[in-house]
């Protein structure tokens, strides 16, 4: 019989196996990334907040970053997705209730977001840098969990549209703006705080909302405004427990915007009936539903026939939040990969110190930082657009470009970060699978890639000042990087004739977005990061994988800057 090798000494034996049954000691396994500060541990975010005029919020952001990075808060994000919402169409007596039940963790995250003003702060506390401060808060909160951000975004985005109707604004905006989260399933008049949803797309149209068939029948004026009855359906209604929905329907004068409450003012249920909840690959904590509108009360927002124009500001705001959310996903994915590799050894050295892995980590960090930098630059444009026409023009083209590019870069980024963790990254008790499933969502929601590219074309053709503002922004970095200068020169040459823009839309928008990111990086990021970004993205190296970087870059400095703790 073979004999088990004896321990070297008694102390080793006791430490390894005090009961005589252990098979091995656990070592070379990273600790979980928890109890870290999402603001103080993010140099790119700190620099961006200071650069874009929001240094006044730094202390508040640091306090929030510590709270959001705690093990307790991070666990809420996991719980909200492991316990998806459930629908009760009827109660046990057969009464129609259309009630969606959420896990308590979802409500805790919603409450935290509302208390931080993510749903309203630039409207209720306008000041220089208000949009940048909100973007920074949202960016950190979305790293914890993405799904609850949907109703927060829609509530935030509703204000510009509702403000156009004084009667509706007077009745609804005070509670929409309140920093009180009230999830009770009761009429709006009985609540202290309200959330607002969107209900636009239908089965036959999708993004082509002008093809909507839901009908609006005028009822006359009441205390809220011009009342209508809506009959039809909506195929994608997220956060169906919101207190009211901005929606589109065909009125006698054409496609029109309406506000439809979930409860009527008399306390009866408005017949917006939930058919079922969608089974989504990602964004699981956030209920998305199919609904039928069986004579639902709604009030007109804006003139008949101007529905798309009326709701456009809301759509623009939701698209900007897609930029924030995707940037946040990239940051958390990169942070997970970096933190794992700084602790894990293979073949005699830490992964983070091995050249091939360091190149991958640096590339992931560059993408995350450039996405955040562009997002915060657009936030500054939103802050300044009322006072500076050029900033307004810049936002018109930069927002759809950013939404298109950043959101489309996120899925591949999430996968590569997952691979850095090896097999552990594919396990469901890791945050990586959730980040991976979440990654494609923002690229699809609020207008997919081609829709964003066509919006860029419209901005260029209908508002030439937007094109001028874009290149004025790019040209402010002229002379600072040869690769960027060459890229911009070729881009300008190719855009002299826009006759075939639609056919070349993806190519041109890719290059426009890269030029914008590179310009922001060259002007603001550390030289190591800016030079590496331009060398990797603009020097025409062709198809590549993450980490296929050119020689001569300071990768160690890039990685060091991106470490979360």
PLM region descriptions:
Residues 1-127, 146:
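Extended, charge-enriched "interface" segments that sit outside catalytic cores
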Residues 225-271:
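A short core secondary-structure module
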Residues 369-403, 418-419, 492-505, 509:
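C-terminal helix-coil-helix/basic helical segment that borders enzyme active sites and/or dimer interfaces
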């Amino acid at each position: 019989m073979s004999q088990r090798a004896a321990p070297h000494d008694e102390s080793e034996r006791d430490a390894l196996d005090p009961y005589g049954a252990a098979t091995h000691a656990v070592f070379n396994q990273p600790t979980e990334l928890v109890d870290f500060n999402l603001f103080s541990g993010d140099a790119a975010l700190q620099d961006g907040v200071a650069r874009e005029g929001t240094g006044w919020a730094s202390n508040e952001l640091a306090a929030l970053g510590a709270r959001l990075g705690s093990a307790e808060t991070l666990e809420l994000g996991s719980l909200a997705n492991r316990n998806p919402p459930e629908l009760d169409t009827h109660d046990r007596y057969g009464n129609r209730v259309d009630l969606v039940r959420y896990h308590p963790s979802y409500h805790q995250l919603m409450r935290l977001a509302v208390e931080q003003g993510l749903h309203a702060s630039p409207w209720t506390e306008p000041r220089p840098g208000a949009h940048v401060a909100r973007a920074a808060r949202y960016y950190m909160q979305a790293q914890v969990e993405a799904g609850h951000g949907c109703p927060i975004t829609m509530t935030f985005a509703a204000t510009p549209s509702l403000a156009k109707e004084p009667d509706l604004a007077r009745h609804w905006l005070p509670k929409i703006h309140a920093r009180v989260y009230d999830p009770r399933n009761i009429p709006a008049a009985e609540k202290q705080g309200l959330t607002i949803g969107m209900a636009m797309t239908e089965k036959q149209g999708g993004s082509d909302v002008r093809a909507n068939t839901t009908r609006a029948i005028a009822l006359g004026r009441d205390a809220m405004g011009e009342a209508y009855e809506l009959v039809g359906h909506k195929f994608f209604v997220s956060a169906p427990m919101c207190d009211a929905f901005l929606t589109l329907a065909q009125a006698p004068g054409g496609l029109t915007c309406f506000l439809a409450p979930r409860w009527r003012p008399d306390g009866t249920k408005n017949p917006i009936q939930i058919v079922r909840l969608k089974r989504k690959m990602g964004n699981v904590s956030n209920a998305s539903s199919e609904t039928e509108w069986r004579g639902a009360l709604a009030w007109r927002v804006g003139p008949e026939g101007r529905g798309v124009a009326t709701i456009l500001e809301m759509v623009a705001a939701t698209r900007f939040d897609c930029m924030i959310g995707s940037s946040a996903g990239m940051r958390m994915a990169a942070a997970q990969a970096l933190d794992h590799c700084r602790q894990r050894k293979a073949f005699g050295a830490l992964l983070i110190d091995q050249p091939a892995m360091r190149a991958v980590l640096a590339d992931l960090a560059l993408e995350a930082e450039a996405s955040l930098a562009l997002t915060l630059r657009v936030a500054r444009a939103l802050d300044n657009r009322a006072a500076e026409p050029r900033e307004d023009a810049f936002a018109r083209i930069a927002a759809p470009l950013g939404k298109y590019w950043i959101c489309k870069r996120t899925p591949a980024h999430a996968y590569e970060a997952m691979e850095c963790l090896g097999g552990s990254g594919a396990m469901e008790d890791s945050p990586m699978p959730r980040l991976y499933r979440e990654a494609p969502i923002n690229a699809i929601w609020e207008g997919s890639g081609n829709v964003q590219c066509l919006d860029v074309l419209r901005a260029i053709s209908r508002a030439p000042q937007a094109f001028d503002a874009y290149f004025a922004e790019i040209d402010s970095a002229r002379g600072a990087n040869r690769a960027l200068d060459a890229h911009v020169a070729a881009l300008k040459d190719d855009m002299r004739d826009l006759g075939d823009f639609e056919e070349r839309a993806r190519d041109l928008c890719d290059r426009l977005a890269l030029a914008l990111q590179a310009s922001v990086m060259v002007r603001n990021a550390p030289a190591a990061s800016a030079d590496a970004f331009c060398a990797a993205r603009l020097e025409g190296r062709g198809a590549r994988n993450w980490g296929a970087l050119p020689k001569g870059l300071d990768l160690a400095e890039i990685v060091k800057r991106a470490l979360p703790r």
